[in-house]
Amino acid sequence: MEKSVENFFSCVRGHPAMVQKHSAGANILVGSDQSQRNTAQSIIRHCPKKLEYSFTYVELDTENHEQVIKEIDRCDMFIFMYDSSIRSDINPHGPSFIPPLKPKMAEHWKKSVLLREYGEFFKEAFSESIDDIAARNERIIAAAQRARRVQFHDGFGGSLHGTLDQTWKSLDGRNHYDLMPGEVATRVLDLAGSVLFGGTFLSTVPFAIKYGVIDPILKIGIERSQVVSVESANRQLEDDFRLYLDKCAGNRIVEEFGIGTNLNVRLHGRNASFEERHPGLHLGLGGGERGSHHLDLVFSSGKILFDDTVIFDGAFRV
């Protein structure tokens, strides 16, 4: 756990809220629900002493929300860890302690770190050095910039292909409000083909909670970066996915072509943001147009090629 906490605070140091402080030390508010209390307290306990951070801990389930609001105002950063999607009393607005805090959290979003559904998997999520992840991301982007086309093969005869855009973002735990490291992403405007999707989902729409990590049973057809067909042997899954697609035209658009690069992340079907960093492809649908909801399809396997060069086939080749 100590190494994961050390890696986590390497990301914290690179968060814009800390970079812009221009002074040593920081006052950090750590809040958790009861289910994540042990992990939250381990983060405080194992923080490297050289950072000279001071911590205030609050239990979000029980602490008076007015007191939490005061602590948010006065801190340099707040780190909240809690379960939302996997709770038995799941609510689209989050657990009951969140709505009273929401306006203040929104006001200070630039100093917020939200680790929803991480729990016991915090250790896994931050177990790889961000230096290693950053170097891997740089190599992948450099390889992309030497290529013109991208291909993805699902291993079952299906594939996607498109023209590479050379505008990439790298999430490596440095200088980004999303401090979870392990992703490079771009947009492919002419993505086309048909694939069998197996893996998990990440969205405000709770597909992951209902279906977990699925076998390759969802066939998805894409033309010019829009989902045009879907079918599955699991009729309920097919109906639910169609309902999502038909709810808003923007939900059909492939807004993101992402590659997870955090080698130690596994898929758990928790609707947790760190699962998007699982090695390999994820496609982000929706979220770019008013009324649409972003839905990540995180593939459990497959092969990625830039031009005819294999970049990933279960392991990275760059």
Q: What kind of region is each of these model predictions?
A:
Residues 174, 289-318:
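Charge-rich, low-complexity terminal tails
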Residues 216-231, 304:
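Active-site and channel-lining beta-strand-loop segments
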Residues 35-36, 84-85, 157, 200-202, ...:
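Short, glycine-/Ser/Thr-/acidic-enriched flexible segments
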Residues 210-219, 235-243:
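Conserved mixed alpha/beta catalytic, RNA-binding, or beta-rich assembly cores of soluble enzyme
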Residues 1-216, 314, 318:
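Active-site bordering "gate/hinge" segments
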Residues 154, 197, 223, 306-307:
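Structural motif
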Residues 228-256:
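A beta-strand-loop signature enriched in Asp, Gly, Thr, and Trp
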Residues 250-303:
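Cysteine/selenocysteine-centered motifs that mediate thiol-based redox chemistry or coordinate metal-sulfur cofactors
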